[in-house]
């Protein structure tokens, strides 16, 4: 019997990468899974688009664990669609215990060259999308009256001044503000809220064209920002999922309002 047996987890951005890994890991720990993804292009996003086939593969892998899964193509910028999915999840599974706000996009450029549309797109997905996920799910956790765990996927860029991704860095810092404020609001309901801060995860987001070239060109002045304390350059999504699974479980029942770096110590630099 897994440590999440009998629980239900709601995960955004789960068609591939970290989101898929989180879905599989929480299912392996015994949770039934609700997983969404936009499954298509997002304006201004430089990461390869996810597809409906990607989301279907996530569902297949979750089912292989023996757990139930509900999937839907949803854009986190669409609050009503997220609310509809949360309502349907409650109707199908009867409960909701864990929320993982994972959906995100990435683009790069020098701050003074970003267009308003590029800024808005990243902020709308990476910050407003987190708010929408909370708005759609937290009322169910409160009404259920059995506590819960809300896990917000931020980034090492949410804890330091990462250059060339000002919109992304601003959004991920904003997620920290959401985490800390929401943790105080939900404490009376025994609902915990924490943020996770990955760095260097081997997903499509690491393959954004041009970003690493720009970083290398500025290595003399900005290189230390990207240096790790531990002797590694990248990690697997499953390494982040281990922290997500821990925060979702009763093993972390007294932890709330925390920022958890999983980043080789880069934020310690």
Describe the predicted segments one by one.
Residues 155:
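Residue(s) in the substrate-gating loop at a strand-loop-helix junction
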Residues 160, 231, 245, 256-269:
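Short C-terminal tail/terminal secondary-structure segment
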């Amino acid at each position: 019997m897994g440590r999440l047996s009998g629980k239900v987890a709601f995960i955004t951005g789960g068609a591939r990468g970290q989101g898929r890994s989180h879905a599989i890991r929480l299912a392996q720990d015994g949770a039934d899974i609700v997983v969404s993804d936009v499954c298509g292009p997002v304006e201004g996003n430089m990461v390869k688009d996810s597809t409906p086939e990607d989301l279907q593969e996530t569902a297949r892998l979750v089912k292989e664990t023996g757990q139930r899964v509900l999937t839907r193509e949803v854009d986190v910028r669409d609050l009503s669609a997220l609310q509809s999915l949360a309502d349907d999840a409650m109707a199908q599974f009867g409960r909701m215990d864990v929320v993982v706000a994972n959906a995100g996009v990435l683009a790069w450029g020098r701050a003074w060259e970003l267009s308003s549309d590029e800024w808005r797109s990243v902020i709308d997905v990476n910050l407003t999308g987190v708010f929408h996920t909370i708005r759609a799910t937290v009322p169910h956790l409160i009404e259920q009256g059995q506590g819960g765990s809300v896990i917000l996927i931020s980034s090492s860029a949410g804890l330091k001044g990462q250059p060339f991704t000002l919109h992304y860095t601003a959004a991920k810092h904003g997620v920290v503000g959401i985490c800390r404020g929401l943790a105080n609001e939900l404490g009376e309901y025994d609902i915990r809220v924490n943020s996770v801060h990955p760095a260097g995860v081997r997903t499509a987001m690491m393959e954004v064209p041009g970003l690493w070239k720009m970083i290398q060109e500025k290595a003399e002045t900005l290189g230390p920002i990207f240096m790790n304390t531990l002797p590694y350059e990248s990690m697997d999504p499953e390494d982040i999922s281990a922290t997500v699974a821990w925060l979702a479980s009763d093993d972390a029942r007294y932890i709330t309002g925390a920022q958890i770096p999983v980043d080789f110590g880069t934020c310690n630099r």
